[in-house]
Structures are given as C-alpha cells and as structure tokens.
C-alpha cells in the first residue's frame, strides 16, 4: 500500500490537568470525582486510550495476541486511586508492536496515532501522511543551500562513527483535500470536532437501515484492548488475549 509494510504503530495522549471537579461537600467526593477511583473508573485506559487503540487493529486488520504495561501515580498525588501515567505494548501475531502512552502531567505533544510503514508514515490526527524518501531539491538549489551554510569551508579527514538521526522535517501530504484537526486538550469551541460526521453517519444509517461498517466491532475490541491493558498493568505480567 501507500505506506509500504507497516512495522510499528505508536499512539499517545498527553494532558496537563488533574481531572478534579469542585466538591460542595466531602460526602460527594467519590460521586463527583468518580474518574479518580477504581470503584467507578479504569482511569486513562478507558477515558483516553480506548479512543485510539482501535487504530492498530484498523491499520493491521488483525487483533493483538498479548499486552504488557506499567502504570503509576507520578504527579497528582492527591488521594486518587487511578494511574496518572501509563505505558502499554500490544504485540500482534505478525510481530508488529503498538505502543501506547498517556499521562496528565504534561500536554506539550497533545495526542496522535502514528502508523509507521517501510515507505511512509501516517498521522491521522494531523490528517497527513509522509513518504520516507523526499524528492531532492534541484541541483542549483542544493548548491545555493550548501554555500549559504558554508558546507565547503572545512573538509574533514576523520569523523564520528555515527551521525544523529533527527526526525524528518518534510511537511507531508493531506490525507483529504479538506481536513479539520483540533487540539487534543479540548474540542469545546473548536471549528470541528467530528460531531457533524458522526451525526451524518447516524442519519444515513437510520434512513438506509444499514449501520456503519464495523462500528460495533471496533467499539467492542477497543474496550477489550483497554481493559486487558489495565489488567496487565495491575497484575504486572504479560496478558495473553483469550480466544
């Protein structure tokens, strides 16, 4: 396909807030701030991760066979019970791993899913894909660039045995001609949060009597991936997926 052979998938969601809401009376703490307590909430794996984990299944057209993970309360040491930082690794039958990371103590990188193939990379949240090999600039442009950066000033007879491989800076291509992306922090007040597409799909399904393809399956498996990931964290072991 366009991305070549998919050999890795990464997903993450970073926020910087405590999830707490004001409580008018102490006896209402667990009811109002239910997200913080294991009796009511699975924390990051169900609040955030389940929105992204199905991307791996969709890209690979298969389900993982096992998962390992770690979680801790790293920053918000305020009496909560659920983790504020998690890392998960899902292993697929073909050897591909999907890594997932989430925390609520830093929001710099926001959220993203990254599908990494031998020929290119896709970032759905940005609505872009990137090819591994970018067309080089014309010869004259390369020469001007080298002169401007004084490439020819010094000639080295010996050098390091390795060169740092920094991230690609190519601008990529839009997946669709018109695409709206939003910050992972909040969709309130955003120009588009996907609601129109969801309502449109619902109306189409209601009118035609045909549900959106794989909708229930993707929701189910995303939930299962999240819950088994939490089990792996809580039990400190690799969880093999049941048949």
Task: Write out the residue ranges for each language-model feature.
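Predominantly a Rossmann-like dinucleotide-binding segment in NAD(P)-dependent oxidoreductases
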Residues: 1-80, 110-114, 236
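Acidic/polar loop patches that form or flank catalytic/metal-binding clefts of enzymes
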Residues: 6-7, 62-70, 97-101, 122-125, ...
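Active-site donor-binding loop signature of nucleotide-sugar glycosyltransferases
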Residues: 11-13, 102, 243
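NAD(P)-dinucleotide binding in Rossmann-like oxidoreductases
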Residues: 78-80, 94-193
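Residues forming the flavin
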Residues: 88
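Short hydrophobic/aromatic beta-strand micro-patches
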Residues: 91
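C-terminal helix-rich "cap/oligomerization" subdomain common to oxidoreductases
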Residues: 161-192, 196-197, 201-243
């Amino acid at each position: 396909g366009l991305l070549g052979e998919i050999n890795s998938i990464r997903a993450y969601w970073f926020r910087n807030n405590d999830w707490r809401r004001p409580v008018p009376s102490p006896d209402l703490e667990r009811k109002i701030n239910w997200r913080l307590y294991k009796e009511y909430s699975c924390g990051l794996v169900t609040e955030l991760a389940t929105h992204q984990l199905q991307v791996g299944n969709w890209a690979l057209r298969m389900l993982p066979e096992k998962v390992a993970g770690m979680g801790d309360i790293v920053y918000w040491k305020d009496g909560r019970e659920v983790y504020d930082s998690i890392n998960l690794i899902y292993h697929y039958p073909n050897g591909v791993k999907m890594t997932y990371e989430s925390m609520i103590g830093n929001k710099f990188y926001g959220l993203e899913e990254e599908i990494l193939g031998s020929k290119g990379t896709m970032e759905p949240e940005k609505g872009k894909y990137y090819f591994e090999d970018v067309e080089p600039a014309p010869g004259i442009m390369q020469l001007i660039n080298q002169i401007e950066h004084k490439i020819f000033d010094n000639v080295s007879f010996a050098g390091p045995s390795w060169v740092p491989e920094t991230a690609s800076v190519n601008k990529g291509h839009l997946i669709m001609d018109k695409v709206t992306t939003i910050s992972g922090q909040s969709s309130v007040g955003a120009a588009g949060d996907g609601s129109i597409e969801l309502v449109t799909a619902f109306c189409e399904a209601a009118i035609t009597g045909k549900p959106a393809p794989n909708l229930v399956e993707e929701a189910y498996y995303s939930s299962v991936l999240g819950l088994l990931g939490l089990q792996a964290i809580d039990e400190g072991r690799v969880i093999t997926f049941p048949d």
